[in-house]
């Protein structure tokens, strides 16, 4: 049975661990790692089937078969290269880190050299399968419009740099418009989906992103519009935010769980 190691015990990491513990995913939850030992302890006390060990990154990489990063873009930069060098397959949740072209090329090269797989779940959006299919021909444009309740954008570097007072926003307000390469830096905890869309389609510079704060919303809304030789594709997802972290949509965690199930399944459905 595949031994899983999870790095990052926040909402997404926790949901993945609970799914494995309940038998939704046919794998062994072997190890956890987090900068906060209290988060590891809190998560392990919720589990019934498995008692994963709390390990350092180095210990985890030596003892598991498959690594799940659900921590941060910083963790992707520091840990994922080590995992690939150790010959481990990796699922990356903080996909925004791959806007860094040098890092992206390095990870892809390491995966090839060490015969490893890198997995990037669809996250909190629908339509990645369609974008993947459309990329077999020419894609002309890709636009992501993200709408969130203002406080769901709290702490974003773009918000803090401009001194935007989110609590004073009373109507729909455009906070950012630009390429995905800049969006993932401006809102690293909010628009990881922009990175996934970029990887599936026309890249970080050509993928356009709009971030809107809307006080009338109680959900995180992602709209994708793609035009190309195939025609036009439009999707809209209204995500319930995580009760633990309003920056994260519940669907993002479900996407990770679904990806793991697909990896382990003999039957593959969809692009």
Curated annotation (Swiss-Prot):
Reactions that this protein is recorded to catalyse: L-aspartate + NADP(+) + H2O = oxaloacetate + NH4(+) + NADPH + H(+); L-aspartate + NAD(+) + H2O = oxaloacetate + NH4(+) + NADH + H(+)
Pathway in which this enzyme or protein is active: Cofactor biosynthesis; NAD(+) biosynthesis; iminoaspartate from L-aspartate (dehydrogenase route): step 1/1
Coiled-coil region(s): none
Assigned EC number: 1.4.1.21
SUPFAM superfamilies the UniProt entry points to: Glyceraldehyde-3-phosphate dehydrogenase-like, C-terminal domain, NAD(P)-binding Rossmann-fold domains
Positions of the catalytic residues: 222
GO molecular function, one term: oxidoreductase activity, acting on the CH-NH2 group of donors, NAD or NADP as acceptor
Cystine crosslinks: none
Organism domain of life: Archaea
Other facts: The iminoaspartate product is unstable in aqueous solution and can decompose to oxaloacetate and ammonia.
Protein family: Belongs to the L-aspartate dehydrogenase family.
Designated name of the protein: L-aspartate dehydrogenase
Species name: Methanosarcina barkeri (strain Fusaro / DSM 804)
């Amino acid at each position: 049975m595949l031994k899983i190691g999870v790095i990052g015990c926040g909402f997404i990491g926790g949901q993945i661990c609970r799914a494995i513990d309940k038998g939704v995913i046919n794998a062994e939850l072997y190890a956890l790692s987090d900068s906060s030992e209290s988060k590891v302890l809190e998560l392990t006390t919720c589990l019934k089937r498995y008692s994963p060990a709390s390990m350092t990154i180095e210990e985890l990489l030596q003892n598991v078969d498959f690594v799940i990063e659900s921590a941060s873009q910083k963790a992707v930069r520091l840990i994922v290269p080590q995992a690939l060098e150790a010959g481990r397959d990796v699922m990356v949740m903080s996909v925004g880190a791959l806007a860094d072209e040098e890092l992206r090329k390095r990870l892809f090269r390491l995966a090839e050299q060490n015969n490893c797989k890198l997995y990037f779940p669809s996250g909190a959006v629908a339509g990645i399968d369609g974008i993947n299919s459309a990329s077999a021909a020419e894609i002309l444009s890709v636009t992501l419009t993200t709408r969130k309740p203002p406080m769901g954008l709290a702490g974003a570097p773009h918000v803090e740099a401009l001194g935007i007072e989110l609590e004073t926003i009373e109507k729909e307000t455009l906070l950012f418009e630009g390429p995905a390469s800049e969006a993932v830096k401006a809102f690293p905890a909010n628009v990881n989906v922009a990175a996934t869309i970029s990887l599936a389609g026309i890249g970080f510079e050509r993928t356009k992103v709009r971030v809107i704060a809307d006080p009338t919303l109680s959900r995180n809304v992602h709209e994708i519009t793609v035009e190309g030789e195939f025609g036009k594709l439009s999707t809209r997802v209204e995500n319930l935010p995580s009760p633990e972290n309003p920056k994260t949509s519940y669907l993002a965690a479900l996407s990770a769980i679904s990806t793991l199930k697909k990896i382990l399944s003999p039957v593959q459905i969809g692009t």
